[in-house]
Design a protein with these regions (language model features):
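Conserved, mostly hydrophobic/aromatic
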Residues: 36, 84, 92, 143, ...
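Glycine-rich phosphate-binding active-site loops on the catalytic face of alpha/beta enzymes
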Residues: 36, 96, 142-159
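Active-site beta->alpha loop and helix N-cap motifs at the rims of alpha/beta catalytic domains
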Residues: 1-85, 102
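Core active-site phosphate/anionic-ligand binding loop and the adjoining beta-turn-alpha structural block
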Residues: 134, 159, 167-170, 177-234
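Alpha-helix-loop-beta-strand connector modules within alpha/beta enzyme cores
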Residues: 1-2, 49-65, 106-123, 167-179
Length: 386
């Protein structure tokens, strides 16, 4: 399970008791490995989730959100990896969400990490820039323990290298996986029609299926690219695609050069779209932009642009401590708010993360159970005509 540290699955930091309860229930319901990351690589935002996974005997895999910039040196990565191991992580994932890790850089990084920590190293990348298979090859030769792949119908583009290709690449070598290619072919054949359906329906956009070398210039992750394409379509501004791509690294620099991974990728991307469509930079800022520049998401590797920060948040106080230290426990309050809908413990967490969607779902679930028509029900007063 991919887990956004203190942000869990959402876009804001939650109280420690909510994080701990979510980890506990995830493991109780069958999750075994929790990949925990933070969009700032701020380890303060990871410690609660890691300790909770340790307590419940789950596998805590902590991700390094890989990115480029003069602050992101080998010394930076090895230092943070050592601290992650000391924190109690069971393994480390190099999370290359934008496909920026080049083959020979992968050799350097994996070699340095293997010399620094004893826990296993997993490499996760995307094919957006077209180099992912070569990056995996060099990483495996350098000693990486795990690589993440996707079955061929859903591979390449903003996804991962194809499983079948990597299996065949290493066949007959010391890295042979032993996987049966015939069985993999059966799996691929099963999913191929679904790919075609997704393309025909528009659920998958052909724009994100190919190689985009501009990724290496603008450092845009696959998920962020998909989101940006969708935002521009909604605004009938698809012609602004290249302008937004050029704006993204400028916004990222203003924001202290964070790695572009959820939620920072969406915050930077949405702000870049606003800057381009409004015709003036930071004329309009999202609430998430204001929160980021206020330190609510944690510490960035570089300082914010002071002029941009002043324009966006004015004299708002900037957080310098661990953001979650300012959030009182909220689990009891959340349970009290939704107690009329609670049928199982997990409902509390659904409501905590997605209150509006959860409430709509709870109403629908109850209607199905009681065989009532929600269009006739007075849900506010819990009344129904007879």
């Amino acid at each position: 399970m991919l887990f956004r540290g203190q942000n869990i699955l959402g876009y804001r930091p939650y109280a420690d008791d909510v994080v701990e309860y979510f980890v506990q229930k995830s493991l109780a319901n069958g999750i075994d490995i929790i990949r925990i990351f933070d969009c700032m690589n701020d380890l303060r935002n990871l410690q609660t989730a890691v300790h909770a996974a340790n307590k419940e005997h789950g596998h805590a895999q902590v991700a390094l959100s890989y990115t480029l910039g003069d602050a992101y040196t080998l010394e930076y990565w090895t230092s943070i990896a050592k601290r992650i191991e000391e924190m109690g992580a069971d393994s480390i994932c190099i999370k290359d969400m934008a496909g920026l890790l080049l083959p020979y850089k992968a050799t350097e990084l994996v070699t340095a990490l293997k010399e620094t920590v004893k826990i296993p190293i997993d490499l996760h990348t995307h094919y957006t820039s077209g180099v992912a298979s070569m990056t995996y090859l060099k990483a495996v030769e350098a000693g990486v323990d795990i690589i993440d792949t996707a079955m061929s119908p859903f591979a390449l583009g903003t996804s991962q290298p194809a499983t079948e290709v990597m299996v065949e690449t290493f066949r007959g070598t010391p890295y042979d996986t032993g996987y049966d290619q015939n069985l993999l072919a059966e799996i691929a054949d099963y999913f191929r029609p679904y790919r075609e359906e997704c393309l025909k329906s528009g659920l998958m956009d052909p724009k994100v299926l190919g190689v985009n070398i501009k990724t290496l210039m603008y450092q845009v992750p696959g998920g962020m690219l998909s989101n940006m394409v969708s935002q521009l379509k909604e605004q009938n501004a698809s012609d602004k695609y290249d302008d937004v791509l050029k704006e993204i690294p400028k916004v990222r620099k203003d924001f202290g050069e964070p790695p572009l991974v959820t939620p920072s990728s969406q915050i930077v991307g949405t702000q870049a779209v606003f800057n381009v469509l409004m015709g003036e930079r930071y004329k309009m800022a999202t609430d998430q932009t204001k929160d980021l520049l206020s330190g609510k998401y944690g510490r960035t590797v570089k300082p914010f642009n002071p002029e941009v920060q002043k324009k966006v948040i004015g004299d708002r106080e900037v957080i310098t401590c661990r953001p979650a230290d300012l959030i009182p426990n909220e689990l009891e309050k959340i349970e009290s708010e939704m107690k009329q809908w609670k049928q199982q413990d997990e409902d509390i967490l659904t409501y905590a993360l997605f209150p509006q969607v959860a409430t709509d779902f709870f109403k629908y679930r109850l209607a199905q159970q009681e065989k009532v028509d929600l269009k006739q029900a007075d849900t506010k007063n819990a009344a129904y005509p007879v």
